[in-house]
């Protein structure tokens, strides 16, 4: 990851996205991912109608190909997709367990230098949840994190070095524009 910030030309020859992640999903995270199809259905019929930042076609492809072996960034995205439509806490003075789990996994990915378009999308959904539930100053900090992730991924300028690699298809391009 440091190579990107020190010399983006060296970085562009290194395929970071295919490197294995050392992050192992906890049993708690896996328990929340029990029904991926239901999570996707609820998200795309609710939140996606007013905030279309995730490609349904791409997400279906990623989740279908990862049966039994979900990547951590996709797991975080699915947690946050579940959080926004279902995110009402039983006790409004205490954050939901799902929110705390998503927030913890987000911090784990950041500590392990795992920055992808999926993790940015998850953070955007996390920010929506925090703003909607008036969780301040966490909401402001998450929005700032989203901005920094977008800049690091090169989404702010098409001529900027692209941490996420080159765009391979129209779906990639469209999703980056919406992210």
From Swiss-Prot:
Chief place where the protein resides: nucleus
**Keyword hit for Nucleus:** yes
Q: Which GO terms describe its molecular function?
A: DNA binding; zinc ion binding
Instruction: Supply the alphabetized keyword list.
Output: Nucleus, Transcription, Transcription regulation, Virulence
Q: Which GO terms describe its cellular component?
A: nucleus
Family annotation (Pfam families): Fungal_trans
* The organism's place on the tree of life at top rank: Eukaryota
Report whether Transcription shows up as a keyword of the record: yes
Q: Where does it live in the cell?
A: Nucleus
Q: Could you mention a single GO BP entry for this protein?
A: DNA-templated transcription
Q: Describe the task this protein carries out.
A: Transcription factor that probably coregulates the gene clusters that mediates the biosynthesis of botcinin acid and its botcinin derivatives, acetate-derived polyketides that contribute to virulence when combined with the sesquiterpene botrydial. Botcinin acid and its derivatives have been shown to induce chlorosis and necrosis during host plant infection, but also have antifungal activities.
Name-wise, this protein is Transcription factor BOA15
Species whose genome carries this gene: Botryotinia fuckeliana (strain B05.10)
Q: What is the lineage of its organism?
A: Eukaryota, Fungi, Dikarya, Ascomycota, Pezizomycotina
